Amino acid sequence: IFDRKELLGDYSRAFFSDSTAFYHNRLSGFLGHYKSTERENTYVEMAIDWEGMYSEQSREMFRIISAGRYTLERGFYFGYAFSMFHFAGSKLNENVTDNLLVNPYVGWGFNAYFDFDIKAGFLFAPQRGRSVDHNWKKPCGAQIDFVLTKWGVKLENNLYLGENLQPLRNIAVGEDIPVTYGQDGLYAGEPFYATTKNVYNRTWVGYDRRFFKGTLAVEAGMVFHYDGTGMGTQQVVKLSVDIQKLFNIGPKAKK
C-alpha cells in the first residue's frame, strides 16, 4: 500500500478527479519508478492498483497506470500518461468492461518574472462495455494546460476540446440493474469530460504553497467549470500535514 502522492506522473483530471485523488488516496499493489539524477523532471513509472475483489456484491477491479517525462534544454519537455482499468463483474453482475486512456503531451516551462508552464496533449480513450455491445468506442480530444505561479499565488487553466471521453457514463450496467456505469465507478476522471458540447474548461485561481520542507501544505482557491451548457463553481480550502515528515518516520532517502 502506498500513498498516491508518491506517483511522479502528470495525470490529467481526465484520469483522476480531485475527489478521486482525495478519497482514494492509497493505492494497493505495486509502484516502481526511475528518476534521472542528471536531468530535472525526467522519470518513468508504472503502478498497479488493485481496487476491488470479486464477491457477491463487489466487482473485481484493478488499474495499471504508467507515466514518463523527458526534459530537454531550456525547459522544453515531452511525456505521456497511460491508464488501463479492468472493470470486471461481481456474482450478481458478470459483465466486464475495458477502459483505457492514453495522453501523450509536449510542454514548455520557463520563468519570466512569473513561473509559466504551457502544455498541449492528446487524449485517446478506447473502451468497451461488453454488456452493452462488443464494439470499441474510441473518443478522443486535445487538451491545453496553462499554469502561472508566483509566491504561491496560482492561476491554472485546462481547456479540453473533443468528444465525450466517458460515453458509457449514463448507460445501465445491465438489463435488470438500474445502476449506470457512472454510478458504478467505471470512471475515475472528472465527469465534465463527458461533455456533449465538445468543450470543457476548468480555471483555478488561488493560493497553493508548501512550508517547512513540504511538511505543511496550504491550498485555497476558486474553481470555475464550463462544459458548453453552463458554468459551475467550487470553493477549495485545504490544509494538510505530512505526518511522516513531521515525526521523521518511514523510509529515509539514501545519501
Describe each region flagged by the PLM:
Residues 1-69, 81-86:
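Surface-exposed coil loops of outer-membrane beta-barrel proteins
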Residues 41-47, 51, 57, 65-72, ...:
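Exposed, low-structure sequence patches enriched in small/polar residues
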